[in-house]
A protein has these predicted regions:
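N-terminal loops that bind phosphate or other acidic moieties
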Residues: 2-137, 141-380
């Protein structure tokens, strides 16, 4: 196979290698066989999940910063986010400040968790000149409709007696007025690009509370209470902003965080991989490639539902470029990916092994597999 340019666009291999390491290892394998005759372009990828911040940091030249914010139960914690100050870009993961994994199982109760810490991260980004904020909203512990985040940015929520409310899920039902007088004015110049891979509306049986409440600690009684409270909150949003966001796909994401971002800010909700495509200038970089190599830790039937390898493959097929996937393992029904642009898929596991051995030897196994593939291609 005549190869002049190869684009290597993998996701991370969970718990063993980040996407950059995967890309470097594949390049090393091909260089061992082809020498320096090929132009390589390594583009670390992610689909909005783990590794997204790293992929975007690589693309923008961003640096990670750590600040003190409040966790979902309003306790001080350290949380990190990334900034590329020269590009006025910030990359924030909601889970860093308001994530479910920050709470013990017995602490998880969406009646009392708040997204305030996410607002504090946004405020710190504003303090350093951010004009574009890329926000990943997966893995949240909250069902407060983004009111905690809004509070941290200056919005005031008051009850029927004019008393200021400290916002969490339970207090949504007590909102009488939303006052945006003190909302940080810098937000008028900010664009939010939100990595959101769910289409749930804000309310109802397919909405934020019913679908995601249980994993955040809500029982059925709590779910009914929270959904009613969320409906009341949405009525107040309409009065305050003139916008009805309930039926916008993704408004229910992250316990209603999507609704708050859509209602109050210049926001687009986009699939995580599409944000990575945009920031990395992916389409421009692949269109003259002779081969695209992608991969992920485990490829199976779920891969066809928006995961990185299929996203990369579908993009490559727009330019009629062949696509090879190299993965940590190939799971049940992985062959479905062949209907979505991937021409051939390989596992790096060559013999029965323990999980510990697989993770420990993943780099060498990847090098071996990629070398074998390079040898086959050179025969053609």
């Amino acid at each position: 196979m005549q190869l002049q340019k190869i684009v290597i666009a993998p996701d991370s291999f969970k718990e063993s290698m980040n996407a950059q390491q995967v890309g470097n290892t594949i390049k090393k394998a091909f260089t061992n066989i082809y020498g320096n005759t090929i132009n390589y372009d390594i583009i670390p990828m992610a689909d909005g999940g783990e590794g997204t911040t790293d992929a975007l940091m690589h693309a923008t030249g961003a640096t990670k910063y750590t600040v003190i914010v409040n966790d979902p139960l309003m306790r001080p914690i350290e949380a990190s986010y990334a900034r590329a100050d020269e590009h006025q870009i910030a990359i924030i993961e909601m889970a860093a400040a308001s994530g479910l994994d920050l709470l013990k199982k017995e602490e998880r109760n969406p009646l009392y968790t708040s997204s305030y810490g996410t607002g504090e991260l946004i405020k710190d980004a504003l303090d350093h000149g951010a004009k574009t904020i890329i926000l990943g909203i997966g893995g949240s512990a909250t069902n407060d409709g983004g009111t905690g985040m809004l509070s941290a940015l200056g919005v005031q929520f008051t009850d029927a007696n004019g008393k200021l409310l400290h916002m969490h899920g339970d207090n949504l039902a007590h909102i009488a007025q939303i006052d945006t007088t003190n909302l940080d004015t810098r937000l008028k110049e900010v664009t939010f690009k939100v990595a959101c891979d769910v289409n749930n509306p804000l309310l109802g049986e397919h909405g934020a509370t019913y679908i995601y409440g249980p994993q955040k600690g809500a029982d059925m009684k709590m779910i009914q209470k929270l959904d009613f409270a969320m409906s009341h909150y949405h009525d107040k949003i309409k009065i305050c902003t003139g916008k009805s966001v309930n039926q916008v796909p993704g408004s229910g994401a992250a316990g209603g965080m999507g609704a708050a971002l859509l209602a109050f800010f210049d926001t687009t909700l986009t699939k995580g991989i599409d944000i990575v495509f945009d920031i990395t200038n992916f389409h421009q970089r692949i269109k003259d490639a002779d081969l695209v190599i992608t991969g992920e830790g485990r490829m199976d039937y779920q891969t066809i539902f928006g995961k990185t390898p299929v996203g990369v493959a579908l993009a490559a097929k727009q330019y009629h470029i062949p696509v090879i996937a190299i993965c940590g393992s190939l799971g049940e029904n992985y062959q479905h990916v062949y209907d979505f642009g991937i021409d051939s898929a390989y596992s790096i596991i060559s013999s029965p092994s323990t999980l510990e051995d697989v993770l420990q030897n993943s780099e060498q196994n990847l090098l071996n597999t990629a070398t074998d593939i390079a040898r086959i291609l050179k025969l053609q």
